[in-house]
Each structure stands twice: as structure tokens, then as C-alpha cells.
């Protein structure tokens, strides 16, 4: 009889530890309620205009009472997660719903402060839109015993309908920077000497922030770690001061094409620290007027003038979302300039009117041979125009 009793208890324990397809964690506290919610992801697209927007394939939702995690549930769906249903939790006032999407964090049991202190680093995986972390946090609300539904439409059967018709907003931690187009219209004084072919060029991000917070009004980290996609001569913007690091990240370099660009992290251009602006640069061989590589003495003349480096490569850098250099902006720049902001897509249009520079991480003359226009529309998208 005693053996039979222990056997039945063992079966019960196994049943309690079984996982369902939604990866539902065991309730952290005694529960008398459930929360379900619908998400609203920011309108978006991948950096390339023609690419499909990435789906949320993994979403973890946590319910907090102060610092205490009272409930957690993770849902994974290859076709995209639009809602999370039936999070076991405890009723009470001043509860907060926190969500993290497309992530690899271990979140079970973490306090609210611990979750909000999480950071991420820019890696090659982030250049695929499906690997972009998204986060969201609700205002405080009351959970009642029974079923609670957040963001569901009016008329939903529920013991407590919260934020009816207004789903929980979930937004990307990353921003996008890209070239919407590059045209070459050499000014009269250069037409008989130089040309440039964007079709054979490459693009790279320079002085891109390596780390970022994933929660907060500003996600700019306190670290002084930066990444570059191509090594160029040091300039005023190059992170080389004490405590700064500057590393190669090969994924921040690709062939030029209309719409080509990169996902990057939030950054603030600190004037007291020589700006450290995130730069999007197109580069390639400076050519003669007939489209051929420069030969002597024209190559030496171009090198001495600072138009190209020793192998004839010229760079056309654009300081992304920078207020200056004659850049022209259109669209709703609602979050200010001189910084990179999450969930913004900075789309840059260039008009090249002359040779570039051999030091793209240096300030350029006001009358540089690059016209830049930049547009901001949802994602949010910032359209920026520049003329060299």
C-alpha cells in the first residue's frame, strides 16, 4: 500500500512539471487570476525597402507587483506571435505587464529592476530582421480574480477588460540606417578629372555603438564601446580616448544597392566627447572622367588633395541624423537630432558632386561635395539628404 502511494505521488509530480507547447512556466506565486493580452508592434519594415517585415516568433510576458515577478509565460510561433493568453498570476492593484520579444534571455524569477537593466550588443545576427529584440511595458493596472484581458476590443468576454481597443505597444530596440539612393553629378570643376561609380561601391557603418539598454526612455548605454565596418585612417570622430574601444564588425559592411543598410543601436552625439557620431559611408575607387582607375600623376594629385587614400579609394561619409553639414531633412523628426533613436529608420539620399575624402571619421568642410537629404516616416523613418 505504501509503495502504491509513493508511485501515485511520483506520477502527480511528473504531471506538474510537464511543459505545454507555449513553454508556460510554473506560477511563481499562488494564483487566482490570468492575464491575456494583444500586442501592437510598431509599423515597420526591414532596412531594405523591398524586404518583408520580420515577425515576432518568440514573446515572453511577465506580470510584476512592484519588483516581484508574479507570472511569466513564453509563446513561440513560427508564423508570428500576436497575443499571449492565460498568464497565471495573482489579483491586485498596481500590476505592470512587461514583454520581451525575439530574445535569448533567461527571465524567470528576475525582479523588475533586473529585467529593465538588461543590455544587448550589436552582432552579425542583428543584421537579420528576425533577430531584432523588441520590448514593451504597460502602465500600472488592476488585475481582478478570474480572466483579465489587456488591449482586447470592446465586447470581449472577460472578468476585467483593461485598455480596451489599445493593444500593448512593442517596439524595436534597434534602429535602421540605409541609403535610399546615390546619384553622381560631378560639378563643373571636377567633370574633366573625376568620376565615381556607386554600382561598384561598398557601404559601411562607422562609430556604431556596440551596446544598448533594452528598456528606458533612452537606451544609450554608459559604455564607450564602438564598432566599425571598414578600417579607415583615424580622425577626430575615431573612438581612441582613454576608456574607449573600437572594434571591427564585418557585418557592418556590404555592397552598395538602393535600400542597402544596417541595423544599429541607440547613440547620442556628445559634443564634449568630439561627437562620436554614427556614420554611414559609401566608398570605392575614385575614377578618372572616363570611369577608369586613376593613374599617375592624377593619383598622386588626388592623394595629396585628401580626395583618396594610397590605393585610390575615396569615402563619402554621412553623419546620420546630424544637425549640420547642410543636411536636409523631411518627415516627422519627433525625437530630435544628433542621436540615433530606437525604432527609427534613417534613410539617406546622396548627390555626389565631387571627389570624397581619405579620412571619413574627420569633420568635413561645409562645402563638401555631398548633398544629403534624410526622411523620417514610420518605422519611424528619417529621410536625410546630403550633397558632396
From Swiss-Prot:
| GO cellular component terms attached to this protein's record | cell outer membrane; pilus
- Specify the propeptide location in this chain: 19-45
What PROSITE patterns does the database record attribute to this sequence? PROKAR_LIPOPROTEIN (PS51257)
Q: Which residues form the signal peptide?
A: 1-18
Lipid-modified residues of type S-diacylglycerol cysteine are 19
Miscellaneous comment as given in the Swiss-Prot or TrEMBL entry: The name (major fimbrium subunit) does not indicate the abundance of the protein, but is derived from the greater length of the major fimbriae. In strain ATCC 33277 and strain 381, major fimbriae are 300 - 1600 nM in length and about 5 nm in diameter. In contrast, minor fimbriae are only about 80 - 120 nm long. This length difference is observed only in a small number of strains, including strain ATCC 33277 and strain 381, and is due to a loss of function mutation in FimB, a protein that restricts fimbrial length in other strains.
Functional description taken from the UniProt entry: Structural subunit of the major fimbriae. These long, filamentous pili are attached to the cell surface; they mediate biofilm formation, adhesion onto host cells and onto other bacteria that are part of the oral microbiome. They play an important role in the invasion of periodontal tissues. Fimbriae and their constituents are major virulence factors. FimA proteins from different strains have highly divergent sequences, and this has been used for classification. The sequence-based classification correlates with pathogenicity.
Name it.
Answer: Major fimbrium subunit FimA type-4
User: Which organism encodes this protein?
Assistant: Porphyromonas gingivalis (Bacteroides gingivalis)
Q: What is the lineage of its organism?
A: Bacteria, Pseudomonadati, Bacteroidota, Bacteroidia, Bacteroidales
Q: Which gene encodes it?
A: fimA
Amino acid at each position: 500500500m505504501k509503495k502504491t502511494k509513493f508511485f501515485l505521488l511520483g506520477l502527480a509530480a511528473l504531471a506538474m512539471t510537464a511543459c505545454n507547447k507555449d513553454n508556460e512556466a510554473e506560477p511563481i506565486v499562488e494564483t487566482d487570476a490570468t492575464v491575456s493580452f494583444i500586442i501592437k508592434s510598431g509599423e515597420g519594415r526591414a532596412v531594405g525597402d523591398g524586404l518583408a517585415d520580420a515577425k515576432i516568433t518568440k514573446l515572453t510576458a511577465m506580470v510584476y507587483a512592484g519588483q516581484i515577478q508574479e507570472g511569466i509565460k513564453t509563446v513561440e510561433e513560427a508564423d508570428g506571435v500576436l497575443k499571449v493568453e492565460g498568464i497565471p498570476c495573482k489579483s491586485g492593484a498596481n500590476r505592470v505587464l512587461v514583454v520581451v520579444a525575439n530574445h535569448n534571455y533567461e527571465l524567470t524569477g528576475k525582479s523588475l529592476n533586473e529585467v529593465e537593466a538588461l543590455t544587448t550588443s550589436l552582432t552579425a545576427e542583428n543584421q537579420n530582421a528576425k533577430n531584432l529584440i523588441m520590448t514593451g511595458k504597460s502602465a500600472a493596472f488592476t488585475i481582478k480574480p478570474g480572466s483579465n484581458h489587456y488591449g482586447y476590443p470592446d465586447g470581449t468576454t472577460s472578468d476585467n477588460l483593461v485598455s480596451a481597443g489599445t493593444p500593448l505597444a512593442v517596439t524595436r530596440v534597434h534602429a535602421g540606417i540605409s541609403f535610399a539612393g546615390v546619384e553622381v553629378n560631378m560639378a563643373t570643376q571636377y567633370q574633366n578629372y573625376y568620376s565615381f561609380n556607386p554600382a561598384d561601391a561598398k557601404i559601411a557603418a562607422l562609430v556604431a555603438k556596440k551596446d544598448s539598454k533594452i528598456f528606458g526612455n533612452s537606451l544609450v548605454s554608459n559604455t564607450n564601446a564602438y564598432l566599425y565596418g571598414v578600417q579607415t585612417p583615424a580622425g577626430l570622430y575615431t573612438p581612441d580616448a582613454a576608456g574607449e574601444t573600437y572594434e571591427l564588425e564585418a557585418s557592418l559592411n556590404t555592397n552598395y544597392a538602393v535600400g542597402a543598410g544596417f541595423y544599429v543601436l541607440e547613440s547620442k552625439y556628445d559634443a564634449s566627447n568630439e561627437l562620436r557620431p554614427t556614420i554611414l559611408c559609401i566608398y570605392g575607387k575614385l575614377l578618372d572622367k572616363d570611369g577608369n582607375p586613376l593613374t599617375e600623376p592624377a593619383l598622386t594629385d588626388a592623394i595629396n588633395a585628401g580626395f583618396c587614400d594610397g590605393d585610390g579609394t575615396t569615402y563619402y561619409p554621412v553623419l546620420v541624423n546630424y544637425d549640420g553639414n547642410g543636411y536636409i531633412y523631411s518627415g516627422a523628426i519627433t525625437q530630435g537630432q544628433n542621436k540615433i533613436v530606437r525604432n527609427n529608420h534613417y534613410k539617406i539620399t546622396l548627390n555626389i558632386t565631387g571627389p570624397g575624402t581619405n579620412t571619413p571619421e574627420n569633420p568635413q568642410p561645409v562645402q563638401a561635395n555631398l548633398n544629403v537629404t534624410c526622411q523620417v516616416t514610420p518605422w519611424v523613418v528619417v529621410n536625410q539628404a546630403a550633397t558632396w
